[in-house]
């Protein structure tokens, strides 16, 4: 198992999307640091378990990004808990956590939980609407969220989420500059080695999600691109 | 200066309330572990500075509980930052923090900041209305907030706020039972030694606020009552 603070590249697989055994094998054996299982729509216990069982055949680190209380199941190496810092509704900042802990507080293994301070920045993405995110932010707003994540809340992760399109590199750069202990995750629009390499210059962790469903071959090249960057 | 994790008794002074020099001296020399400066209404830079300057003549630890961005001033030993965990509006959970850090992020000394996970429980109190708190909670809700504060957010403090009336001892007891590293602060309706002693059996820190404006002599006796309890 690869410890979360050593991650540089991760693939994010959506339980609600189809993936062939061959493609899944290529993803799991790609040399990526971890697979995150997570999605926005129709994440159920059934499709989560089904995907999890297929991934578990490979020795790759596997984390569940918890989006639905009903879809939590034991056995993952980590449980990533998003807090949407720029949501306009308390349920996405703390409410879902409270509900989960009220129900499962006594049996949770807290060591496996990792908080992600999300900053959702693509207003056209499903997740922005779903989580009622205020995406009309300037770069100083984002920097302030990064500082909150690092110093005030001491989250393990700060997650710049552009979901579906690539965000401006300046935002990644500025957020990176104020983070030390908190790891910067970047997700959104990474489809090939060049995309990944550009982001890896600043983000600690590059997430490749949709890209692998669109062009697997190109998506697989992001692993090497990120690793090369980190080994320089 | 007394480190925050050694506090057992604190007095909370409201910048918007009058206190004579004699009373202030008695409070500061009472043996309490710290004075918290904070209030809900009409906290201004002027009245905060004025109270602070008077307290600083004494060698007691002094913390500012930040409620208004305009009333922040350097020189306090600690800055307590409330996050109202059961607020129904994001501004009380994270919004005010974001605004403050956007403005002052570069000059903040993060070592002096202490997060307080507030659970505001007296629906009739000004603060509940002000912070739009959902006070209709059962004991399991409160326990879940305590667990969130301890394990998920790792706040230094979890604050049971009954502001103006005494809360049920069972709530204090149950919250206390799930907290280890996070210190349990209790505030609300503590007017005399008996009140303080009862709460000190479970809370790490007993706050005496309004009581000292109502009957100073009785309020001062709470210091000894808490200390006695902790030394048993």
Curated annotation (Swiss-Prot), chains A, B:
Prenyltransferase that catalyzes in vivo the transfer of the heptaprenyl moiety of heptaprenyl pyrophosphate (HepPP; 35 carbon atoms) to the C3 hydroxyl of sn-glycerol-1-phosphate (G1P), producing heptaprenylglyceryl phosphate (HepGP). This reaction is an ether-bond-formation step in the biosynthesis of archaea-type G1P-based membrane lipids found in Bacillales. GO terms for biological process: glycerophospholipid biosynthetic process. InterPro entries: GGGP/HepGP_synthase_I, GGGP/HepGP_synthase_sf, GGGP_HepGP_synthase. Gene3D superfamilies: FMN-linked oxidoreductases. It comes from the Bacteria. SUPFAM superfamilies: FMN-linked oxidoreductases. CDD domains: PcrB_like. Pfam families: PcrB. Sn-glycerol 1-phosphate binds at residues 12, 159-164, 189, 209-210. One of its GO terms (molecular function) is magnesium ion binding. It comes from Shouchella clausii (strain KSM-K16) (Alkalihalobacillus clausii). Pathway: Membrane lipid metabolism; glycerophospholipid metabolism. Its cofactor is Mg(2+). This is Heptaprenylglyceryl phosphate synthase.
